[in-house]
Amino acid sequence: MEEFYGELPLYDIRESKIINLANLGTHHFFEHEMAVIDTHVVQRLKYISQLGPVYNVFPTARHTRFEHTLGVTITLNKMWNSLSENGSLSFLGTGSKPRKILSDLRMSAILHDIGHCPFSHAHMFQKSF
């Protein structure tokens, strides 16, 4: 694994984990996902608000980009499972191809917010006149 992740600074935890989110329940994250989740670049999302300054109006509206990232990954997995169960993914065939695609999608979900800085979406709520 070290050769794959190269020089990424990793925390000591590298095994797979079960993570419990209050609104989405308990979910499994694999070893390679935890190796990325435990990097500083993803862990810093714990300190960036997903909702920007909304908590000034709604004091309990506190949600971090880290929580959002885990939620997106879990929701993606639920969507994949639903599509798989109803046969919508049959065109992918069987074997390792669908597993590889799901793995890539999950990693994309984990990494999708790492480039955001605080309040980066705040401009989306401004009205243009």
Which residue ranges define each predicted feature?
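Metal-dependent phosphohydrolase cores
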Residues: 1-129
